[in-house]
Amino acid sequence: MSELSPHSPFSVTELNRQVRRLLEVSFMQVWVTGEISNFSCPSSGHWYFSLKDDKAQVRCAMFRNRNMFVKQRPRDGEAVTLRAKVSLYEGRGEFQLIAESMELAGEGELRRAFEELKLKLSREGLFEESRKRPLPAMPKQVGVITSPTGAAVRDILTVLERRFPAIPVLLFPVPVQGKEAGPAIVAAIASANRLNCCDVLIVGRGGGSLEDLWAFNEEPVARAIAASAIPVVSAVGHETDITIADLVADLRAPTPSAAAEKVSPDQAEWKHRFLIYEQRLDAAAQRLLRQEGLRLNQLRGRLKHPGRRLQESAQRLDDLEVRLHRQAQNLLSVRRNQLTHLRDRLLASSPRQSLKNRYATVDALNHRLQTAVLSVLRHKSQHFAKLCGHMEAVSPIATLARGYAIVSDENGQIIRSEKEVRTGQKVKARLSDGEIHCEVVASV
């Protein structure tokens, strides 16, 4: 913001613009609770009102693209909580709040409790699609758990009467609002399961505020729905109302009327389906009659006189007898030839000749083995003698035998040079046949 100067004053428009920007930057978003007053809604659809407490008030605006998400239009005197941006209406220089969301005061705690329970049950898997059961195509009886005096039960009965009046309905009357509602709904679900006379249950009520619908957000109600052996359709409030019961139920219907549509077959559709089945059955029966008539005519044409059938059978029997006799003779001849052939092969392969040949083979192998062993022994003896000669040639004993001696000092250390001895030193000389002890007289 530029510095204040009498030579460069702000215009009113510029001042309001600067103040608006400063407010919007300083207060990004605030939550404010107060009482509605001076509420108005012109044809534009925007809401204008004041929010006040016992000491102050502030002008507020909530544009149509935001207020369309508020469940019901507020009235003067209602306490609400706003999420808003702080701003300034430049045209009048009027400080105001631009509301982003609105809920009745006290609904914030309920909404937090709703989110906590929703997270808890979600982690337990109660919202999983895999645990939800299909509804029966043709229920024998529909159970309805709702208020007996509300609009919901009238809507449900009207739809069921229109779609399929033959389906009986069993009403479990319960309060749907207040502290008694939750336990009553739980007890009704338990009763329906205990009676076990309904194929599907509708649990619901008409629309209302979050507080009005709270019984359907209570944990015992959610767990009763999840534990029900009978499939449950939840129909709470309007389409925009989502409760914990909706998330746990096997099917969520946006309204009680829609729930009745979901659980009941369409009578007209079933009549049409039965008509189609009747036509198909009649056509199939006519087709079968024609086919069997043709088959009967064919069989009638093929049917012969019994005497002729007997003659043909007797002739066929004689023919079979001749063929059987001929085949028996052929089989005997074949078996006789096979027996002769086997006898000749047995004589040709006598075990006496085979044993004789085996003995000759063993004798030959034994002779070859003895010859090989003697040859190996001679070769190894010659090689050993040669190795002994080589070892004898390089042996120190052989060297001593040629007149050499190995001289060592008193400690047994070999003396290799005359520099390693001194005059008068005792030494030993090893010869080929013993040792002699000597004394060094001189070294040259």
From Swiss-Prot:
- Cell location: Cytoplasm
Instruction: Give one Pfam family, short name only.
Output: Exonuc_VII_L
Q: Name one GO biological process term.
A: DNA catabolic process
In alphabetical order, the GO MF annotations are: exodeoxyribonuclease VII activity; nucleic acid binding
InterPro entries, alphabetized? Exonuc_VII_L, Exonuc_VII_lsu_C, OB-fold_nuc-bd_dom
Please state what class of enzyme this protein is: hydrolase
> Which reaction is this enzyme known to catalyze?
Exonucleolytic cleavage in either 5'- to 3'- or 3'- to 5'-direction to yield nucleoside 5'-phosphates
What are the EC numbers? 3.1.11.6
CC terms in the record's Gene Ontology section: cytoplasm; exodeoxyribonuclease VII complex
**Keyword entries, A-Z:** Cytoplasm, Exonuclease, Hydrolase, Nuclease
HAMAP family recorded: Exonuc_7_L
NCBIfam families linked: xseA (TIGR00237)
The record describes its quaternary structure and partners as:
Heterooligomer composed of large and small subunits.
The entry's function note states:
Bidirectionally degrades single-stranded DNA into large acid-insoluble oligonucleotides, which are then degraded further into small acid-soluble oligonucleotides.
Q: What protein family does this chain belong to?
A: Belongs to the XseA family.
Concerning PANTHER family, the annotation shows:
EXODEOXYRIBONUCLEASE 7 LARGE SUBUNIT
The name this protein goes by in its record? Exodeoxyribonuclease 7 large subunit
What is the organism field in this record?
Hahella chejuensis (strain KCTC 2396)
